[in-house]
């Protein structure tokens, strides 16, 4: 999917429509001290004595696009609900 690098949209901090710069946000480094990681580690030690096979699953074929809109006037940034796309690139318009 192609998306413009600059978009005129509403800034919730200025309270008006301004030009926003769009930037792609990468996922931060996961902390091993999070509660969910400790829970997964505990769950790994519990078995079912070989009675059932594992449920098939894995990664989805597409990832959610994370983009940040930064206002050119007040320099504050905000996010929007994301969508799924296989390819995502920012283009000049």
UniProtKB/Swiss-Prot annotation:
Entry's Gene Ontology BP terms: translation
Annotated SUPFAM superfamilies: Zn-binding ribosomal proteins
Cofactor: Zn(2+)
UniProtKB keywords: Metal-binding, Ribonucleoprotein, Ribosomal protein, RNA-binding, rRNA-binding, Zinc, Zinc-finger
InterPro entries listed in its UniProt record: Ribosomal_eL44, Ribosomal_LSU_eL42, Ribosomal_zn-bd
Cofactor remark from the record: Binds 1 zinc ion per subunit.
Disulfide bonds: none
Single annotated GO MF: zinc ion binding
Residues bound to Zn(2+): 11, 14, 71, 74
A Pfam family per the record: Ribosomal_L44
Zinc finger residue ranges, C4-type: 11-74
The keyword rRNA-binding is annotated on this UniProt entry: yes
GO CC annotations on file: ribonucleoprotein complex; ribosome
Role according to the record: Binds to the 23S rRNA.
Family: Belongs to the eukaryotic ribosomal protein eL42 family.
UniProt subunit comment: Part of the 50S ribosomal subunit.
Protein name from the UniProt record: Large ribosomal subunit protein eL42
Classification of source organism: Archaea, Methanobacteriati, Methanobacteriota, Archaeoglobi, Archaeoglobales
